[in-house]
Design a protein with these regions (language model features):
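Bacterial N-terminal signal peptides that target proteins for export
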Residues: 2-12
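Mid-chain, well-packed structural core segment of small domains
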Residues: 90-91, 95-103
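Active-site metal-binding core of divalent-cation-utilizing nuclease and nuclease-like domains
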Residues: 25-67, 76-84, 90-91, 109-127, ...
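A short acidic, glycine/proline-enriched capping/turn motif at secondary-structure boundaries
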Residues: 105-107
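Short catalytic-loop micro-motif centered on adjacent basic/acidic residues
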Residues: 71-74, 99-101
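Short Lys/Arg-rich cationic patches that frequently serve as NLS/NoLS or arginine-rich RNA/DNA-binding motifs
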Residues: 5, 24-25
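Bacterial N-terminal signal peptides
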Residues: 11-20
């Protein structure tokens, strides 16, 4: 009986070991949570990774810089700060001001806020991207 129990125990350990190895080797779906996550994903999808990231300027750091745009990446809740930073970075670099906003868990209220931000930025001459939308477009193309 003890021998049979030892064999069963050994078999169970081997199965658990291989299950653990398989779980670690399985591809992981990347979940976007932080501003940096959205910044990197937007650069990769929209600019094919060619935008410069975190470029220092006087009194700040540009999230993404292209030949045309100085881009501030920001949560929709912090759009006020994002607009100010976009204008500042555009002046520092002689590029067009732009704001790339994201929403981690879209609600009706936040989508209404996005509409407001788009209108406000249009009146200020700031290009706006909704990162969630751009990532969804890229996902549908695949």
């Amino acid at each position: 009986m003890k021998t049979r129990l030892k064999q069963l125990y050994s078999y169970l350990l081997i199965v658990l070991f291989f299950a653990l190895i398989s779980a670690c080797a399985a591809p992981k779906h990347h979940i976007l949570e932080t501003e940096k996550d959205y910044q990197e994903a937007f650069n990769r999808i929209y600019f094919q990774g060619h935008a410069q990231m975190e470029v220092p300027v006087n009194y700040g750091r540009i999230d993404l810089l292209t030949g045309d745009y100085a881009i501030e990446v920001e949560r929709i809740d912090k759009f006020h700060e994002g607009i100010g930073q976009a204008l500042h970075y555009a002046k520092e670099t002689r590029r067009k001001p732009s704001l790339a906003v994201f929403i981690t868990d879209p609600t009706e209220h936040e989508l209404e806020k996005l509409k407001y931000v788009r209108k406000l930025c249009q009146s200020l001459g700031i290009k706006v991207w909704y990162i969630n939308e751009e990532l969804e477009k890229a996902h549908k193309k695949k």
